[in-house]
């Protein structure tokens, strides 16, 4: 599916702990737009500590390379300001090079699915983005 069409098909959908949470949207975008399969997480962890522990497992996944800048199709991990460095990531999305330099397609509560620039994410207290390019 075309990236713009995918964004239009999911934008504003609500966040759901047992449905469309941030990792599930990331997986869905990677599969539908790029034909890549990423590991499943059936239910979003409730506590911040559990989310951080789960996201830390990304370092064990050999299916991607790390990029120092955003690029089309990269999985982006984020943390909240004050919660440590990128190793304490608790959120994910997919960077899509649409509308100029691009933006992150992600979903959180209570906002729902959004397509936001790094500046917009920073205003919403998301920080320390790290970009991982799936190679499989």
Where are the regions that the model predicts?
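A broad detector of the eukaryotic-type serine/threonine protein kinase catalytic domain
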Residues: 8-12, 78-81
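...with weaker cross-activation on analogous glycine-rich loops/strands in unrelated enzymes
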Residues: 43-113
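Short amphipathic alpha-helical patches
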Residues: 29-34, 49-57, 128
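Non-catalytic ligand/cofactor/substrate-binding and regulatory segments of enzyme domains
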Residues: 1-11, 114-136
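Active-site nucleophilic cysteine motif
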Residues: 14-34
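Glycine-rich phosphate/pyrophosphate-binding loops
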Residues: 36-41
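Solvent-exposed, flexible loop/coil residues
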Residues: 14, 19, 42, 59, ...
């Amino acid at each position: 599916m075309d990236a713009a069409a995918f964004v239009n098909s999911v934008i504003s959908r609500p966040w759901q702990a047992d449905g469309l949470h941030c990792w599930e949207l990331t997986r869905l975008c990677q599969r539908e737009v790029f034909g890549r399969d990423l590991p499943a997480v059936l239910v979003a962890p409730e506590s911040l500590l559990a989310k951080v522990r789960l996201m830390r497992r990304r370092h064990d996944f050999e299916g991607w390379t790390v990029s120092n800048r955003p690029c089309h199709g990269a999985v982006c991990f984020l943390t909240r300001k004050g919660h440590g460095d990128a190793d304490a990531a608790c959120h994910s999305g997919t960077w899509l090079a649409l509308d100029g330099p691009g933006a992150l397609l992600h979903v959180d509560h209570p906002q729902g699915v959004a397509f936001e620039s790094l500046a917009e994410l920073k205003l919403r207290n998301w920080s320390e983005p790290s970009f991982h390019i799936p190679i499989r």
